[in-house]
């Protein structure tokens, strides 16, 4: 009995040593990134009351280059679950479909070209203030590389998210196309 156990143990050790590779094991999960999931981040509306109540007199961020009448967008929500507004996850074209930033986003946009220079102050979080149909986002400062690698854009809604979070002092430039706006008088009678 004991001799059989010794032989089996030696055989098992020999097989294990012969089949163990000298090189480390490579698996896809080490190199393939999971898809971006916007639902990991709180809706920008969840912070809205805090900004209105606690930062009423504070400068949240500064934008230079914004054309007159253009609006800053922090997020675009198209779903409501009875408690909170959020982005939907209805696939391509939905407000939950984000992809990594790149040059030449929103290539077919029409309107007036503008370059916005944005500096963060009291505003912090993942939702990136922008305007219009963004074609390029360029970060500055010591966190520029981390912000660039962790920023995603939704071309359908014009919304951007920086997963490494914006902080006071962060700066970025946005090349964008501001769409034409219409007055009520211009639209009257067109329906």
Model regions: which residues?
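Helix-boundary/low-complexity linker signature
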Residues: 1-191
């Amino acid at each position: 009995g004991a001799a059989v156990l010794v032989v089996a143990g030696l055989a098992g050790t020999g097989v294990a040593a012969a089949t163990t590779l000298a090189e480390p094991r490579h698996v896809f999960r080490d190199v393939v990134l999971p898809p971006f999931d916007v639902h990991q981040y709180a809706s920008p509306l969840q912070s809205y009351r805090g900004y209105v109540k606690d930062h009423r007199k504070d400068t949240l961020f500064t934008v230079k280059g914004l054309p007159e009448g253009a609006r800053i967008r922090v997020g675009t929500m198209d779903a409501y679950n009875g408690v909170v507004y959020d982005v939907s996850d209805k696939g391509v074209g939905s407000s939950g479909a984000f992809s990594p930033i790149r040059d030449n986003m929103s290539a077919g946009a029409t309107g007036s070209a503008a370059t916005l220079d944005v500096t963060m102050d009291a505003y912090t979080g993942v939702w990136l203030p922008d305007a219009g149909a963004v074609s390029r986002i360029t970060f500055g400062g010591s966190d520029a590389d981390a912000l660039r690698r962790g920023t995603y854009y939704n071309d359908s809604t014009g919304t951007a998210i920086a997963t490494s979070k914006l902080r006071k002092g962060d700066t970025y430039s946005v090349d964008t196309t501001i769409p034409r706006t219409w007055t009520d008088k211009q639209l009257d009678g067109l329906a």
